[in-house]
């Protein structure tokens, strides 16, 4: 059977002042959950971003007031387990499956903020 896995990291906001912040996203096939793969992907992304000089990591997460058959609180719990903390809630921000969901932002600081911050290094692919 095939398994679908996708991960990405991109600039948090498209302005130079936010170059040191990155939003992370991973999507795992249902069969790939609860086996440590998500943690490994996030840790690899965070390590690469830290090497580039990124300081702040963010995750935008759909969050139900009450869990239902479409959305649970697992993603928020996963991020908290990885050291992210809740830094913002947008009430009833997302609408899908004929219902409203909150959107939460979670943050993890992975580097030291200085007054003379070095520029973020561009991404370079290497195997």
Where are these regions (language model features)?
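Short, small-residue-biased leader/transition segments that mark boundaries at the very start
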Residues: 2-5
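Conserved catalytic-core motifs of GNAT/GCN5-like acyltransferases
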Residues: 8, 60-62, 76, 80-99, ...
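A conserved beta-strand-loop-helix scaffold within acyl/acetyltransferase catalytic domains
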Residues: 8-18
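GNAT/GCN5-related N-acetyltransferase fold signature
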Residues: 9-11, 28, 106
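C-terminal "cap" of GNAT-fold acetyltransferases
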Residues: 20-22, 92-127
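A short, internal acetyl-CoA/4′-phosphopantetheine-binding micro-motif in the GNAT/acyltransferase core
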Residues: 25-33, 61-65
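Conserved acetyl-CoA-binding loop-helix of GNAT-fold acetyltransferases
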Residues: 34-51, 72-77, 81
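Conserved GNAT acetyl-CoA-binding A-motif
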Residues: 49-74
């Amino acid at each position: 059977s095939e398994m679908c896995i996708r991960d990405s990291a991109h600039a948090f906001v498209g302005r130079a002042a936010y170059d040191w912040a990155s939003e992370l996203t991973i999507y795992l096939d249902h069969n790939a959950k609860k086996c440590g793969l998500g943690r490994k992907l996030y840790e690899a992304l965070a390590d690469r971003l830290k090497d580039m000089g990124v300081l702040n990591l963010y995750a935008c997460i759909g969050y139900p007031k009450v869990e239902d058959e479409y959305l649970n609180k697992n993603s928020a719990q996963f991020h908290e387990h990885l050291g992210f903390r809740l830094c913002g809630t947008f009430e009833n921000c997302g609408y899908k499956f004929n219902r409203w969901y909150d959107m939460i932002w979670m943050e993890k600081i992975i580097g030291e903020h200085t007054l003379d911050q070095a520029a973020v290094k561009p991404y370079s692919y290497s195997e």
